[in-house]
Amino acid sequence: MKNVKKGKRKKSDKPQFGLISKILLTINILVVVLYLTACYIGYVDPDSASYLALMPMAYPLFLIATIPTLLFWVVKHRRLMLITVCSWLATIPQICAFMPIHFNDIEQAQSEKGSYTLTTYNTYGFAGDKETKNAIIDEILEKNADFVCIQEATTIDDLRYWHTDPDRIARLCARYPYVHFSNKNHTLGCFSKRPIGIIMEQSIGNYFYVEAYKTSGLGGEIYIINTHMESIGLTVDDKRLYMDLTQTAKKETLKGVRSHLLNKLLRADRQRAVQARLIKSIADSLRTASPHTPLFICGDFNDPPYTYSYLTAKGNYSDAYTDAGVGYAHTYNRNRFYFRIDNIFYDDRLVEAEACRVGTSKASDHHSVTATFNNHNK
């Protein structure tokens, strides 16, 4: 009888898919689903999306959360990298809005013949001491834009009343001989180097204002919409709660605080949705009436990129910072709400964004945003 030798079982060349890998795969899939939801829920009306509509506010966190499992798969199971990589490929527009990479020189762009520069700046009513007011004026003068859209504005007379540096006021008035402030609480205003025509003014409640201006630039007439949309809806006390929440909070109070803040945020988000539709209708009517006139939409939108109100107000227009900015940027700088909520949208059929930068001055609770444009056929 022949002896039959049992062959040794060959070890698989593939790495074992153990318990840790299974747990991480589950976490990876869950994080990617949340990440994709944060990227695309902005296309759904907040009335239908409910609390999910707030997810784009946490987009950076979801993006960062996709990285650890990707690094693990690089070492252990490279094929599973595709889960995260495919989610990134599916969200290239969102990534570019969050972290654009355009190495350009805004000063050089401004010096080009025929260029036109816009600044949008929420000045917080020039609140603060004399030095703060002076610093806000310095920020405006430093940017040297052709047209400056102001939110939470104040009049030149008020600046004089508050004993702001008269030399700075004189330089501001000399640089911008054409000045306008809205009739209601002076919430909106603009400074221009060229004559201004007021097309329309509208407000709803105490926090939403929109104006449309007509001026000249880029070789002809241009339209500029200036807006201040509903704030995030949190009071000073609410913001303190949020700061406590981002540090340490007792377990028994955490749930109640979170629910309180989310309800307020959702209510404000739904109000901005209505306001964004109004802004879109104004832009659409101007575009229909004068399709070959460049139009810009500037202001404090109080919502980060790829939220419903951002996408609705932007419509078919382009975001200057996405197209001509560089790196991560936030335009609100207080209470740990580090979001890019101030924007300049433009009609890329007629003009192109040469460069866009977010200011660094903290004199106001917002940073300024400045963009330089030129005609396609420059």
Regions found by a protein language model. Name each.
Residues 121-123, 153, 229, 300-301, ...:
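Active-site metal-binding loops of divalent metal-dependent hydrolases
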Residues 1-18:
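N-terminal Lys/Arg-rich, disordered targeting/topogenic segments
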Residues 5, 20-35, 40-52, 56-74, ...:
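Metal-dependent phosphoester-hydrolase catalytic domains
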Residues 239-265:
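A solvent-exposed, charged loop/short amphipathic helix patch at secondary-structure junctions
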Residues 63-107:
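Transmembrane alpha-helices and immediately adjacent membrane-cytoplasm interface residues
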